[in-house]
């Protein structure tokens, strides 16, 4: 069950790793959260190409910001980045009940829901990550992709037995071949 989304808003200058991590930390402290925090996402985020000028990657920034106190952040990543087409197909299968899973998303997760509805698919099966320009700031950004990517990585990590089963083609999957419709993902 996806309960809530916490977004870094550009107008509040929260759309960067340190600011969003602080926002999450403050929210969790306000709610007296003591159960620990798992930090997951794209395993490529550990690579040198994603570090800041000091050589620190986003996962280190997040765990250091959340601190060593009651939040006890732990990085939980897949060993390597799953192929985008395969992971998107897996997520669609999970939505269809693959391996007995039932995925529900709270109505308050408006941006995630928007991404899942409007994210387009390229002809090769990958996500269309077209950039748009913000009318107010003039800054280019990826309109759809980040939140659906987060969901992909989360499901591939936490449902890893089902993910492995799906990749191997195990299970009682029925494959239906039809004409390709490239209007959007099936999420």
Predicted regions and their residues:
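Mg2+-dependent endonuclease catalytic cores in nucleic-acid-processing enzymes, primarily RNase H-like
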Residues: 1-136, 161, 175, 183-187
């Amino acid at each position: 069950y996806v309960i809530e989304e916490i977004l870094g808003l550009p107008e509040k200058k929260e759309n960067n790793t340190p600011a969003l991590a602080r926002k999450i930390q403050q929210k969790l402290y306000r709610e007296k959260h003591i159960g620990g925090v798992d930090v997951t996402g794209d395993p490529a985020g550990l690579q040198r190409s994603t570090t800041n000028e000091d050589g620190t990657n986003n996962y280190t920034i997040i765990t250091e910001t959340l601190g060593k106190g009651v939040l006890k952040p732990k990085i939980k990543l897949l060993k390597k980045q799953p192929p985008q087409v395969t992971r998107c197909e897996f997520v669609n299968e999970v939505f269809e009940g693959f391996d007995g899973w039932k995925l529900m998303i709270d109505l308050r997760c408006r941006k995630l829901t928007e991404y899942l509805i409007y994210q387009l698919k390229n002809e090769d099966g990958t996500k269309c990550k077209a950039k748009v320009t913000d009318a107010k700031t003039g800054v280019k950004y990826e309109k759809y992709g980040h939140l659906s990517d987060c969901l992909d990585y989360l499901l591939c990590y936490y449902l890893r037995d089902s993910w492995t089963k799906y990749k191997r083609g195990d299970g009682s999957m029925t494959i239906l071949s039809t004409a390709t419709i490239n209007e959007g993902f099936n999420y």
